[in-house]
């Protein structure tokens, strides 16, 4: 059974603000893939004072939609759930616009033997796992570093009521 107030994401429009519930809005980036399904969802929690979760990939249309969605609002925090190329790259732009604290697990360290580019022979891979030629490749955003590092399972609350 579907939650009655949550609209399905299958046919959600790209780069448009969708009201998911009274205090949550969503903007979907136009980056459909096997990793992001219909596209990466950026969530805005609150009404005037807001927290942005997963600013998203570096797509002009997504950045412009976020800019419009946040116009006249006070961004009090930016939360990055994980540092993949479809979730964190617009964080720097949003931080530059708002100065809001960036919360995330990170920064990612590069360990000896870490392979940034995949150079293995893909001829033996399962064809179902293949990335379409126009599909964005999933990578780790090694440049991202939060202001406040959180650990797995940690919870945090605003001392302010979202208004």
Q: Can you name each region flagged by the protein language model?
A:
Residues 1-16, 118-122:
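Accessory terminal helices/loops
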Residues 57-162:
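Active-site HxH/HxHxD metal-binding segment of metal-dependent hydrolases
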Residues 3, 11-13, 19-21, 81, ...:
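Intrinsic structural disorder
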Residues 51, 162-163:
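Short beta-strand segments
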Residues 7-10, 26-29, 34-35, 144-152, ...:
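Short gly/ser/thr-rich secondary-structure transition/capping motifs
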Residues 10-11, 15-72:
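Conserved beta-strand hairpin/beta-sheet module of binuclear metal-dependent hydrolase folds
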């Amino acid at each position: 059974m579907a939650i009655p107030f949550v609209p399905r994401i299958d046919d959600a429009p790209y780069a448009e603000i969708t009201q998911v519930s009274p205090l949550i809005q969503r903007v979907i980036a136009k980056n459909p893939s096997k990793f992001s399904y219909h596209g990466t969802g950026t969530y805005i929690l609150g009404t005037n004072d807001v927290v942005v979760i997963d600013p998203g990939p570096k797509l002009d249309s997504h950045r412009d939609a976020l800019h419009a969605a946040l116009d006249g609002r006070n961004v009090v925090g930016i939360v990055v759930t994980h540092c993949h190329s479809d979730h964190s790259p617009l964080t720097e732009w949003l931080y530059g616009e708002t100065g809001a604290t960036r919360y995330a697990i990170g920064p990612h360290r590069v360990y000896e033997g870490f392979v940034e580019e995949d150079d293995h022979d893909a001829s033996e891979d399962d064809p179902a796992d293949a990335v379409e030629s126009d599909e964005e490749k999933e990578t780790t955003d090694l440049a991202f570093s939060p202001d406040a590092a959180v650990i797995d399972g940690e919870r945090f609350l605003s001392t302010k009521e979202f208004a």
